[in-house]
């Protein structure tokens, strides 16, 4: 029986931390977790996609609170009193989402666990925007953490890429090469006892104890391509009228600033080590476009480095950035089995977006990406919104032979089967 991590701790059990890093709080429903063992990275991704499809109608749900920061991701009970899971960012391998079924999932390993033993944690929301923002927050955290670790690979000063907006993508069809019987619902565990990957993580207390930023801070100054609602105020009012504002997904332009402030607090030494002047961290903070556009362009990092990282990402991962010195033209670089393949995207005289050598036209870049995420024959492979963490560490650096910590079981784990992750 595996007993690692810090599951089930109440905030009062650990005392208050002297400093609570800035975090972004979101709400979701936890479905469960399943193992992803003894597979290479791409096979693990295919398995996760298969399992998300198999579990799309799973009725098991548990309301939880997710807190994002540059240190990692913490999951609390719905009341905010019990810390269920806490994953250091360096132990999270992959993040993905499925808009059609309102699913968000990430793969992570436990402290001192081998790289071949991973768990996938699955969450759902009531609408696509709720889970999309969870995925975007985690992906941008990956990128900002990499930038802080590798300041020498930052992008040189150049015009900021135009916004591309947030895209509700459809799920990809399963890729070939991996066939495995889907997990049954009785094999999906909601016991998070052994699914925690922070080594030592103080609890943050009740909901609202962390620092929150006002919504007005860091509003985007750029107009969204292909979107007539260029004003954040108009976007928000439209969302309120359509009653889909609950998740706060339309406030994505503020999350970039919040994540960067979290980076400054979580890694003060690395932040201060950034060069001053053009291309320094002040330029990074002022890049306050939406999370989607910054993730697509890997904002802040040089293009050669971004392409090198793309070559190591999952099949279908992509970068989208405007061509330098060319108006109305973009480069879409896609990770395929043949390597990274570039495609030219342009805007025609009718204001519609097209991919070179293909007749289809789209009203926005978002629509173009959405189409090629579900169309298998238009490109070498469909686009995939999933992202690998470039700062992922396969093993922990610590004293050799140190046994994993053992903590008391969760109060809701009543049976031996639950403790083994089969309840």
UniProtKB/Swiss-Prot annotation:
Interacts with BCR. Gene3D superfamilies: Pleckstrin-homology domain (PH domain)/Phosphotyrosine-binding domain (PTB), SH2 domain. Its main location: other. The keyword Oxidoreductase does not apply. This is SH2 domain-containing protein 5. Residues 28-146 form the PID domain. It is found in: Postsynaptic density. Residues 296-392 form the SH2 domain. CDD domains: PTB_tensin-related, SH2. May be involved in synaptic plasticity regulation through the control of Rac-GTP levels. Residues 392-423 are annotated as: Disordered. Keywords: SH2 domain, Synapse. One of its GO terms (cellular component) is postsynaptic density.
């Amino acid at each position: 029986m595996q007993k690692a991590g810090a599951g089930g701790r109440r905030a009062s059990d650990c005392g208050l931390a002297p400093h609570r890093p800035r975090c972004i709080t979101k709400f979701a429903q936890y479905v469960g977790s399943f193992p992803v063992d003894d597979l290479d990275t791409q096979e693990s991704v295919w398995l996760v996609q298969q399992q998300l499809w198999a579990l799309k109608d799973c009725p098991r749900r548990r309301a939880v609170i997710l807190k994002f920061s540059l240190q990692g991701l913490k999951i609390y009970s719905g009341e905010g009193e019990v810390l269920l899971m806490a994953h250091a960012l360096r132990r999270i391998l992959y993040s993905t989402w499925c808009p059609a079924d309102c699913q968000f999932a990430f793969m992570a390993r436990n402290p001192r666990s081998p790289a071949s033993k991973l768990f996938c944690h699955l969450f759902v929301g009531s609408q696509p925007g709720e889970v999309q923002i969870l995925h975007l927050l985690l992906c941008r955290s990956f990128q900002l953490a990499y930038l802080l670790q590798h300041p020498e690979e930052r992008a040189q000063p150049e015009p900021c890429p135009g916004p591309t907006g947030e895209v509700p993508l459809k799920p990809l069809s399963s890729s070939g090469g991996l066939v495995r019987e889907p997990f049954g619902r009785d094999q999906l565990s909601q016991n998070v006892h052994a699914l925690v990957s922070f080594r030592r993580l103080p609890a943050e207390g009740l909901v609202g104890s962390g620092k929150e930023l006002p919504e007005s801070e860091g509003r985007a100054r750029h107009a969204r391509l292909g979107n007539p609602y260029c004003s954040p105020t108009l976007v928000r009012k439209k969302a309120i009228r359509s009653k889909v504002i609950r998740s706060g997904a339309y406030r994505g332009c503020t999350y970039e600033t919040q994540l960067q402030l979290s980076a400054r607090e979580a890694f003060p030494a690395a932040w201060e080590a950034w060069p001053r002047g053009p291309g320094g961290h002040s330029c990074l903070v002022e890049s306050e476009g939406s999370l989607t556009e910054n993730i697509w362009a890997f904002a802040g990092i040089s293009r050669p480095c971004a392409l090198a990282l793309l070559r190591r990402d999952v099949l279908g991962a992509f970068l989208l950035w405007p061509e330098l010195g060319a108006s109305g033209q973009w480069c879409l670089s896609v990770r395929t089995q043949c390597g990274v393949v570039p495609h030219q995207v342009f805007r025609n005289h009718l204001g519609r977006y097209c991919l070179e050598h293909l007749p289809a036209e789209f009203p926005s870049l978002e629509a173009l990406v959405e189409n090629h995420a579900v169309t298998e024959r238009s490109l070498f492979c469909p686009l995939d919104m999933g992202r690998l963490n470039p700062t992922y560490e396969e093993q922990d650096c610590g004293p050799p032979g140190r046994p994993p910590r053992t903590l008391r079981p969760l109060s809701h784990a009543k049976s031996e089967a639950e403790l083994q992750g089969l309840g």
